């Protein structure tokens, strides 16, 4: 079996909903980090790319009709290079990376690009066709996040709780209090701010040129979602599900825009094109859980991937646990034996501070983990995420 190595990884800044990247189409946004890979790796014969696999959770708007293929062409790769878009909702970007790695490990491919994209700001409203002629029962659905066009059988079998409702379910079932959630959220903001101030994200971010109505483009070079806060300020926020709820806008991830791309190669291709392997993709695993507590999906996914990798949680030097909600992140961490303030856990902040552009987030986790391993000299990193409709995904990296 071949080894699959990450040789380079880069992402756009993460934009706020309706923020600096809101005017950029998803396919154009996805092309940005691919172009950056091309520019940063001049020794590569890009006609040798076997496939481009991108994750995207929406695909109802400008990201329709295989956004990976669109981005491949828009980035200037040869038209002979194929592209495929995968959708495991929030886990799409990490899934794309794992799929690409498995293709290389099997020997079927040698050089791949994997990543993800999401423009939640530009997610469209959609309307289904009428069930009968001349019907006036048309319903418009917002595709930004969560359920739409719900199957009545799914509603009857599992319910269709919104994402914040699933977090409240987790908080209740796993006894995660409001104060603990707010403290976790504050740590995320503080760590993200420290990472930004120290320039830790510089190597992994490619600035995005955003066209303006007049004059020069606006260059966006910094994550837009982090915000200064205090425990007192967080405590004043009302629950988003119910007034006495524990899940608030302050201890939940954002609705965001962003894209990320990674260059993968086997050992021969890396040597042939003068690439430096930075991390080996050790293993990936997925798991299913009840949709109403989808946030705890990483528990079984992590246990499974560690079993496949033959490793333990104690061997992980970096743990990138996607912070969809503080409630679910705490529930996952505690179930796995990770302390709430573990220094290995999201050392540069997580999605509560940085944002969660759904299809891009998994690729972002792997990118940030790779650079963190290089900075600290750690050996192993764990990346894991919960997934809407009740799944979890986990991936292990080893620094080379």
At which residue positions do the language-model features occur?
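N-terminal extracellular/periplasmic Venus flytrap/periplasmic-binding protein-like
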Residues: 11-12, 23, 27-32, 43, ...
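Flexible glycine-/small-residue-enriched beta->alpha junction loops
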Residues: 111-169
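Conserved active-site "lid/cap" helical segment
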Residues: 1-71, 75, 82, 166-178, ...
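Active-site pocket-lining segment
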Residues: 168, 212, 282-353
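Conserved catalytic cysteine-centered active-site region
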Residues: 24, 56-112, 141-147, 157-163, ...
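Condensing-enzyme catalytic core mediating Claisen C-C bond formation in acyl metabolism
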Residues: 1-24, 145, 230-296, 300, ...
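Beta-strand segments within the central parallel beta-sheet cores of soluble alpha/beta enzyme folds
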Residues: 46-55, 82-87, 112-116, 180-187, ...
């Amino acid at each position: 079996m071949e080894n699959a190595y990450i040789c380079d990884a880069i992402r756009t800044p993460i934009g706020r909903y309706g923020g600096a990247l809101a005017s950029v189409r998803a396919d154009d946004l996805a092309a940005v980090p691919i172009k950056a890979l091309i520019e940063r790796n001049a020794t590569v014969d890009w006609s040798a790319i076997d496939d481009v696999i991108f994750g995207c959770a929406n695909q109802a708007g400008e990201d329709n009709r295989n956004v990976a293929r669109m981005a491949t062409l828009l980035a200037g790769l040869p038209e002979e290079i194929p592209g495929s878009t995968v959708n495991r909702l929030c886990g799409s970007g990490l899934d794309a990376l794992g799929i690409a790695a498995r293709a290389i490990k099997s020997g079927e491919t040698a050089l791949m690009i994997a990543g993800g994209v999401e423009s939640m700001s530009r997610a469209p409203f959609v309307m289904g066709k009428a069930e009968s002629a001349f019907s006036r029962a048309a319903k418009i659905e917002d595709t930004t996040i969560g359920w739409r066009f719900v199957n009545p059988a799914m509603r009857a079998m599992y319910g269709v709780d919104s994402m914040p409702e699933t977090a409240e379910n987790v908080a209740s079932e796993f006894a995660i209090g409001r104060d603990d959630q707010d403290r976790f959220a504050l740590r995320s903001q503080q760590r993200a701010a420290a990472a930004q101030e120290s320039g830790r994200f510089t190597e992994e971010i490619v600035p995005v040129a955003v066209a303006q109505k007049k004059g020069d483009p606006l260059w966006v070079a910094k994550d837009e979602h982090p915000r200064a806060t205090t425990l007192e300020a967080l405590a004043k926020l009302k629950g988003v599900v119910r007034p006495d709820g524990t899940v608030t806008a302050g201890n939940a991830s954002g609705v965001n825009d962003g894209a990320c791309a990674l260059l993968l190669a086997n050992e021969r291709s890396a040597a042939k094109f003068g690439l430096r392997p930075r991390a080996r993709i050790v293993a990936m695993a997925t798991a299913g859980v009840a949709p109403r507590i989808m946030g705890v999906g990483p528990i079984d996914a992590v246990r499974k991937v560690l079993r496949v990798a033959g490793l333990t949680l104690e061997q992980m030097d970096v743990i990138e646990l996607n912070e969809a909600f503080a409630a679910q992140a705490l529930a996952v961490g505690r179930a796995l034996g990770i302390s709430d303030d573990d220094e290995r856990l999201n050392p540069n902040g997580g999605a509560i501070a940085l944002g969660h552009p759904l299809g891009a987030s998994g690729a972002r986790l792997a990118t940030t983990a790779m650079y963190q391993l290089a900075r600290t000299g750690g050996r192993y990193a764990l990346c894991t995420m919960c997934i809407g409709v009740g799944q979890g995904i986990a991936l292990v990296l080893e620094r080379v």
